[in-house]
């Protein structure tokens, strides 16, 4: 039987994932800043895990083990997010302000909305890929949460962003083509990396704002 503590934590996490970012006026009090951060972190963690699982399943199914390392060091695995001033780890993220990290996170999330909108049409023969039809909705939800955080930190008046919007190519539906397999492999690798960055940024912001004891990650 699961202990009361872990079970309560899981129930709280599930409840937070089910919460909308904003409430109707007069229905419930608006979500606190700490609640917005907690919700965003949970959603980013969930998406990052889903991206990692999908990448591993694709790799196991389609990419021979002997070719994986060499492919990941080619242009196929190059991510456009590497061309923007995005921190590559927790220490670098600590040097950025919360709004800078939120703007970078928003850019990363928005760059995947187009490619992921039809992801389920590409991957249809796997239990992992079977969840892909909801990835777009989950990503839109995280985008909404990041925008809500930006509104809170900017006193409800978001400033015009200075970041160049860019998007990844769409996934290739021709899974019988080697070129398509390599392209999709590279895209899934980038998606996993970008979600890891987004999760890291949100956790850094949450930890330094609220001084939690469990900030080590």
UniProtKB/Swiss-Prot annotation:
It comes from Cervus elaphus. Its main location: secreted. It comes from the Eukaryota. It is found in: Secreted. The modification Phosphoserine is found at residue 132. Belongs to the somatotropin/prolactin family. Disulfide bonds join 79-190, 207-215. One of its GO terms (cellular component) is extracellular space. GO terms for molecular function: growth factor activity; growth hormone receptor binding; hormone activity; metal ion binding. This is Somatotropin. Keywords: Disulfide bond, Hormone, Metal-binding, Phosphoprotein, Secreted, Signal, Zinc. PANTHER family: SOMATOTROPIN (PTHR11417:SF2), SOMATOTROPIN,PROLACTIN (PTHR11417). Zn(2+) binds at residues 46, 199. Gene3D superfamilies: 1.20.1250.10. Residues 1-27 form the signal peptide. Plays an important role in growth control. Its major role in stimulating body growth is to stimulate the liver and other tissues to secrete IGF1. It stimulates both the differentiation and proliferation of myoblasts. It also stimulates amino acid uptake and protein synthesis in muscle and other tissues. GO terms for biological process: animal organ development; growth hormone receptor signaling pathway; insulin secretion; positive regulation of growth; positive regulation of receptor signaling pathway via JAK-STAT; response to nutrient levels.
